[in-house]
């Protein structure tokens, strides 16, 4: 009888694993992402993507680059929270504390939406150029991007745009799509 326990135990784990995989893959929502986006903020990321009309993969990648998903993150220049809002920008877009993850992601969505509208006056050639301009405006400020007529020559901003784009196409690819 003792020899049967490993077999029954293995069978039980196989069944549990199969049921877990089936239930995990049955929901195509953003909250069923396979671990790239912290589960507790997946719906917030999906909402920010909807508000901003940008892909959820991009919103998630931006949060990763901004704060590495640390709601208590604070930059040397005073940006705070998951989406790293400067106090002046938080006053315009945020509600409550910048360190509140849900509020930070919600504000990110609205700010990205407004940045998208601002950079549209530069008449981007395509969706990718528009997205790059939005990211550059988030990093360097919309005034700089508009005055430069595009992505400024700041290495930090150029790296920022490239890093988010790459992460959105690799680590976060498909995290909120029907195929994931």
Predicted segments, located by residue:
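Intrinsically disordered, low-complexity regions enriched in Ser/Pro/Gly/Gln/His and often acidic
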Residues: 1, 34, 62, 80-83
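Cell-wall polysaccharide-cleaving catalytic domain and substrate-binding groove, primarily
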Residues: 45, 64-89, 141
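Non-catalytic cell-wall polysaccharide-engagement segments
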Residues: 1-44, 50-52, 88-106, 110, ...
């Amino acid at each position: 009888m003792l020899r049967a326990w490993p077999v029954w135990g293995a069978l039980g784990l196989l069944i549990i694993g199969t049921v877990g995989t089936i239930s995990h893959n049955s929901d195509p929502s953003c909250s069923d992402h396979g671990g790239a986006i912290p589960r507790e903020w997946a719906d917030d990321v999906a909402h920010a993507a909807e508000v901003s009309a940008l892909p959820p993969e991009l919103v998630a990648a931006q949060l990763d680059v901004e704060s590495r998903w640390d709601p208590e993150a604070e930059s040397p220049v005073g940006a705070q929270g998951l989406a790293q809002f400067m106090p002046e920008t938080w006053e315009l877009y945020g509600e409550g504390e910048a360190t509140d993850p849900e509020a930070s992601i919600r504000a990110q969505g609205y700010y990205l939406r407004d940045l998208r509208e601002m950079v549209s006056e530069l008449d981007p050639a395509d969706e990718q150029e528009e997205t790059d301009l939005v990211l550059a405006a988030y990093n360097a400020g919309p005034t700089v991007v508009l005055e430069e007529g595009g992505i400024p020559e700041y290495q930090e901003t150029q790296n920022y745009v490239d890093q988010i784009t790459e992460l959105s196409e690799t680590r976060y690819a498909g995290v909120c799509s029907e195929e994931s």
